Protein backbone atom coordinates (compact mmCIF):
# COMPACT_ATOMS: atom_id res chain seq x y z
CA UNK A 1 0.00 0.00 0.00
CA UNK A 2 1.33 3.41 -0.98
CA UNK A 3 0.96 5.99 1.76
CA UNK A 4 1.70 9.68 1.28
CA UNK A 5 1.17 12.80 3.34
CA UNK A 6 0.49 16.26 1.98
CA UNK A 7 -0.95 19.54 3.09
CA UNK A 8 -1.68 23.16 2.32
CA UNK A 9 -1.37 26.36 4.33
CA UNK A 10 -2.42 29.96 3.81
CA UNK A 11 -0.54 32.60 5.80
CA UNK A 12 -1.70 36.24 5.74
CA UNK A 13 1.16 38.75 5.61
CA UNK A 14 -0.10 42.16 6.60
CA UNK A 15 -3.47 43.25 5.24
CA UNK A 16 -2.97 42.67 1.53
CA UNK A 17 -0.47 39.82 0.99
CA UNK A 18 -1.02 36.08 1.25
CA UNK A 19 1.54 33.28 1.34
CA UNK A 20 0.19 29.94 0.10
CA UNK A 21 2.19 26.77 0.71
CA UNK A 22 1.57 23.27 -0.57
CA UNK A 23 3.39 19.98 -0.02
CA UNK A 24 2.66 16.82 -1.97
CA UNK A 25 -0.61 18.30 -3.30
CA UNK A 26 -3.51 16.08 -4.36
CA UNK A 27 -5.43 17.50 -7.32
CA UNK A 28 -7.71 14.49 -7.73
CA UNK A 29 -10.76 16.56 -6.69
CA UNK A 30 -10.16 19.21 -9.35
CA UNK A 31 -12.96 19.58 -11.89
CA UNK A 32 -12.34 17.55 -15.03
CA UNK A 33 -11.56 19.49 -18.21
CA UNK A 34 -14.25 19.82 -20.85
CA UNK A 35 -13.65 17.62 -23.88
CA UNK A 36 -12.38 19.69 -26.81
CA UNK A 37 -11.81 18.49 -30.36
CA UNK A 38 -8.80 20.27 -31.84
CA UNK A 39 -8.76 20.32 -35.64
CA UNK A 40 -6.00 22.91 -35.90
CA UNK A 41 -2.22 22.65 -35.74
CA UNK A 42 -2.15 24.86 -32.64
CA UNK A 43 -2.17 23.57 -29.07
CA UNK A 44 -5.27 24.22 -26.98
CA UNK A 45 -4.81 26.19 -23.76
CA UNK A 46 -7.22 24.68 -21.26
CA UNK A 47 -8.09 26.84 -18.24
CA UNK A 48 -6.25 26.36 -14.95
CA UNK A 49 -8.53 24.77 -12.32
CA UNK A 50 -6.06 23.75 -9.61
CA UNK A 51 -6.78 26.00 -6.63
CA UNK A 52 -3.13 26.56 -5.73
CA UNK A 53 -2.57 28.27 -9.09
CA UNK A 54 -5.84 30.20 -9.44
CA UNK A 55 -5.76 32.88 -6.71
CA UNK A 56 -4.53 36.20 -8.14
CA UNK A 57 -3.76 34.24 -11.29
CA UNK A 58 -4.14 37.35 -13.47
CA UNK A 59 -0.71 38.36 -12.15
CA UNK A 60 0.83 35.27 -13.75
CA UNK A 61 -1.25 34.35 -16.80
CA UNK A 62 -1.75 37.60 -18.72
CA UNK A 63 1.72 37.99 -20.23
CA UNK A 64 2.06 38.16 -24.00
CA UNK A 65 -0.46 38.89 -26.70
CA UNK A 66 -2.13 35.63 -27.77
CA UNK A 67 -1.63 31.86 -27.77
CA UNK A 68 1.51 32.28 -29.90
CA UNK A 69 3.17 34.57 -27.32
CA UNK A 70 2.61 33.01 -23.90
CA UNK A 71 5.81 32.98 -21.82
CA UNK A 72 4.10 31.34 -18.83
CA UNK A 73 1.21 28.89 -18.67
CA UNK A 74 0.74 27.21 -15.29
CA UNK A 75 -0.90 24.13 -16.79
CA UNK A 76 2.53 23.11 -18.08
CA UNK A 77 3.66 22.58 -14.47
CA UNK A 78 2.84 19.06 -13.38
CA UNK A 79 2.72 17.46 -16.83
CA UNK A 80 5.49 16.08 -19.05
CA UNK A 81 6.05 13.69 -21.93
CA UNK A 82 7.12 10.07 -21.53
CA UNK A 83 9.60 8.33 -23.83
CA UNK A 84 6.83 7.67 -26.37
CA UNK A 85 5.77 11.31 -26.50
CA UNK A 86 2.58 10.80 -24.49
CA UNK A 87 1.51 13.41 -21.96
CA UNK A 88 1.71 12.09 -18.41
CA UNK A 89 1.47 13.51 -14.90
CA UNK A 90 4.70 14.91 -13.45
CA UNK A 91 4.29 14.95 -9.68
CA UNK A 92 4.47 18.30 -7.88
CA UNK A 93 6.56 17.94 -4.72
CA UNK A 94 5.97 21.36 -3.16
CA UNK A 95 5.07 24.93 -4.01
CA UNK A 96 4.92 28.43 -2.57
CA UNK A 97 3.00 31.45 -3.82
CA UNK A 98 3.15 35.00 -2.47
CA UNK A 99 0.65 37.42 -4.00
CA UNK A 100 -1.25 40.59 -3.27
CA UNK A 101 -0.77 44.32 -2.92
CA UNK A 102 2.33 46.15 -1.71
CA UNK A 103 0.35 49.39 -1.79
CA UNK A 104 -2.78 50.72 -3.47
CA UNK A 105 -1.10 50.86 -6.90
CA UNK A 106 1.56 48.11 -6.81
CA UNK A 107 0.88 44.35 -6.88
CA UNK A 108 3.36 41.53 -6.34
CA UNK A 109 3.33 37.94 -7.51
CA UNK A 110 5.87 35.22 -6.68
CA UNK A 111 5.45 31.54 -7.54
CA UNK A 112 7.91 28.72 -6.85
CA UNK A 113 7.06 25.08 -7.64
CA UNK A 114 9.24 21.96 -7.48
CA UNK A 115 8.37 18.95 -9.65
CA UNK A 116 9.66 15.42 -9.09
CA UNK A 117 12.04 13.47 -11.29
CA UNK A 118 10.82 10.44 -13.26
CA UNK A 119 14.03 8.69 -14.22
CA UNK A 120 12.26 5.85 -16.07
CA UNK A 121 10.77 8.39 -18.50
CA UNK A 122 13.86 10.63 -18.51
CA UNK A 123 11.96 13.50 -16.90
CA UNK A 124 14.15 15.69 -14.66
CA UNK A 125 13.16 17.39 -11.43
CA UNK A 126 12.52 21.06 -12.21
CA UNK A 127 12.27 24.21 -10.12
CA UNK A 128 9.79 26.63 -11.71
CA UNK A 129 9.81 30.27 -10.59
CA UNK A 130 7.80 33.33 -11.58
CA UNK A 131 8.29 36.84 -10.18
CA UNK A 132 6.18 39.77 -11.29
CA UNK A 133 5.41 43.36 -10.31
CA UNK A 134 2.42 45.29 -11.67
CA UNK A 135 2.24 49.06 -11.21
CA UNK A 136 -1.01 50.89 -11.86
CA UNK A 137 -0.60 54.05 -13.94
CA UNK A 138 -3.08 56.74 -14.90
CA UNK A 139 -6.65 55.66 -14.20
CA UNK A 140 -6.92 52.03 -15.36
CA UNK A 141 -3.65 51.21 -17.14
CA UNK A 142 -0.63 49.37 -15.74
CA UNK A 143 3.01 48.51 -16.37
CA UNK A 144 4.21 44.97 -15.60
CA UNK A 145 7.65 43.43 -15.18
CA UNK A 146 8.19 39.68 -14.99
CA UNK A 147 10.93 37.10 -14.67
CA UNK A 148 10.21 33.44 -15.41
CA UNK A 149 12.80 30.75 -14.69
CA UNK A 150 12.87 26.97 -15.05
CA UNK A 151 15.91 24.88 -14.20
CA UNK A 152 16.71 21.28 -13.36
CA UNK A 153 17.69 20.56 -9.77
CA UNK A 154 20.71 18.43 -10.71
CA UNK A 155 22.77 17.38 -13.73
CA UNK A 156 20.78 14.49 -15.15
CA UNK A 157 22.78 12.66 -17.83
CA UNK A 158 19.76 12.41 -20.17
CA UNK A 159 19.30 16.20 -20.32
CA UNK A 160 21.19 18.42 -22.77
CA UNK A 161 22.78 21.72 -21.76
CA UNK A 162 20.02 23.66 -23.54
CA UNK A 163 17.32 21.84 -21.57
CA UNK A 164 18.85 22.38 -18.13
CA UNK A 165 17.61 25.93 -17.65
CA UNK A 166 15.69 28.68 -19.38
CA UNK A 167 14.68 32.16 -18.30
CA UNK A 168 12.37 34.74 -19.84
CA UNK A 169 12.09 38.34 -18.72
CA UNK A 170 9.89 41.07 -20.05
CA UNK A 171 8.09 44.34 -19.61
CA UNK A 172 4.56 45.16 -20.72
CA UNK A 173 2.32 48.20 -20.85
CA UNK A 174 -1.42 47.59 -20.71
CA UNK A 175 -3.59 50.49 -21.85
CA UNK A 176 -7.18 50.90 -20.65
CA UNK A 177 -8.64 54.37 -21.10
CA UNK A 178 -10.91 55.88 -18.48
CA UNK A 179 -13.88 55.81 -20.86
CA UNK A 180 -13.15 52.19 -21.92
CA UNK A 181 -12.98 53.19 -25.58
CA UNK A 182 -9.26 52.53 -25.98
CA UNK A 183 -7.53 49.28 -25.03
CA UNK A 184 -4.08 48.07 -25.96
CA UNK A 185 -0.84 46.40 -25.04
CA UNK A 186 2.84 46.82 -25.87
CA UNK A 187 5.43 44.28 -24.77
CA UNK A 188 9.06 43.23 -25.02
CA UNK A 189 10.28 39.77 -23.97
CA UNK A 190 13.76 38.23 -23.98
CA UNK A 191 14.67 34.59 -23.45
CA UNK A 192 17.93 33.26 -22.01
CA UNK A 193 18.91 29.67 -22.83
CA UNK A 194 22.40 28.19 -22.52
CA UNK A 195 23.97 27.81 -25.97
CA UNK A 196 21.13 29.55 -27.83
CA UNK A 197 21.49 33.19 -28.87
CA UNK A 198 19.25 33.49 -31.96
CA UNK A 199 15.56 34.41 -32.03
CA UNK A 200 15.59 35.12 -28.30
CA UNK A 201 13.62 38.39 -28.36
CA UNK A 202 10.07 39.28 -29.30
CA UNK A 203 8.05 42.47 -29.12
CA UNK A 204 4.59 43.49 -30.14
CA UNK A 205 1.82 46.03 -29.89
CA UNK A 206 -1.95 45.87 -30.01
CA UNK A 207 -4.48 48.70 -29.84
CA UNK A 208 -8.27 48.71 -30.11
CA UNK A 209 -10.89 51.42 -30.35
CA UNK A 210 -14.34 50.41 -29.17
CA UNK A 211 -17.62 52.33 -29.25
CA UNK A 212 -21.25 51.27 -29.52
CA UNK A 213 -21.08 51.48 -33.30
CA UNK A 214 -17.39 50.89 -34.04
CA UNK A 215 -14.76 48.30 -33.18
CA UNK A 216 -11.37 48.82 -34.83
CA UNK A 217 -8.14 47.10 -33.85
CA UNK A 218 -4.54 46.69 -34.96
CA UNK A 219 -1.93 44.15 -33.84
CA UNK A 220 1.76 43.96 -34.74
CA UNK A 221 4.10 41.22 -33.45
List each model region and its residues.
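Outer-membrane beta-barrel channel domains
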Residues: 1-221
Amino acid sequence: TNFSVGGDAKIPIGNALNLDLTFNPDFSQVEVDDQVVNLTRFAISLPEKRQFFTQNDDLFKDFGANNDVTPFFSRRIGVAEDLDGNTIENKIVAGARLSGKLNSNLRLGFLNVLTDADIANEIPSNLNTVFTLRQKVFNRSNISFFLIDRRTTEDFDFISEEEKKNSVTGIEYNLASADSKWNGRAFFHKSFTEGLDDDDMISGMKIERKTLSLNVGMEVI
